[in-house]
Amino acid sequence: MSHLALKDLFSGFFVIDDEEEVEVPDKQQQVNEAPAKEQSQQTTKQNAIKSVPQKSASRYTTTSEERNNRMSNYSKNNSRNVVTMNNATPNNASQESSKMCLFEPRVFSDTQDIADELKNRRATLVNLQRIDKVSAKRIIDFLSGTVYAIGGDIQRVGTDIFLCTPDNVEVAGSITDHIENMEHSFD
């Protein structure tokens, strides 16, 4: 805002009209002139507002153009830093899928360690033979939810022994049928 525009704005507020200085002895005349005074004050304010210069629209268009140029330059500069996931995952996936963790939890709180290994895409074999049945059921419920969340699978491979696998591990076949046959052959 320029200096002159500010001066015009403030001078419009402090202008004294000749009509305002005249004293009116009659109350009837004061009542009639009160709306006239308000109207003259409103026109003074409107004139002061009109004297304020409007912001130009060209200022905003240059800003958006500059921003678009900066964003396009930014994306061009950073395009060489992008690495495709297909190139990065084969080595990592083969290393992660080759490791299997064995667990024999004694208390329910040990289940968190099993879930962490599953989240890190490692297969786990869980032996629940040394824990009470109620805790074993809670552990299986928890691991079933974990495996479901990561898109994996849980299978019973023996008496109170479970295989939990993440989505990058595929289990072919079923061991349960073989174990049942082996148990019956020893009887």
Curated annotation (Swiss-Prot):
One GO term of the biological process aspect: FtsZ-dependent cytokinesis
Subcellular location: Cytoplasm
One Pfam family cited in the UniProt record for this chain: SepF
Matching InterPro entries: Cell_div_SepF, Cell_div_SepF/SepF-rel, SepF-like_sf
Biased composition regions of type Polar residues, renumbered to the chain: 38-63, 70-97
Disordered: region residues: 21-97
One term under GO cellular component: cytoplasm
Protein keywords: Cell cycle, Cell division, Cytoplasm, Septation
Family classification: Belongs to the SepF family.
Role: Cell division protein that is part of the divisome complex and is recruited early to the Z-ring. Probably stimulates Z-ring formation, perhaps through the cross-linking of FtsZ protofilaments. Its function overlaps with FtsA.
HAMAP family: SepF
Assembly, per entry: Homodimer. Interacts with FtsZ.
Name of the protein in its database record: Cell division protein SepF
Name of the coding gene: sepF
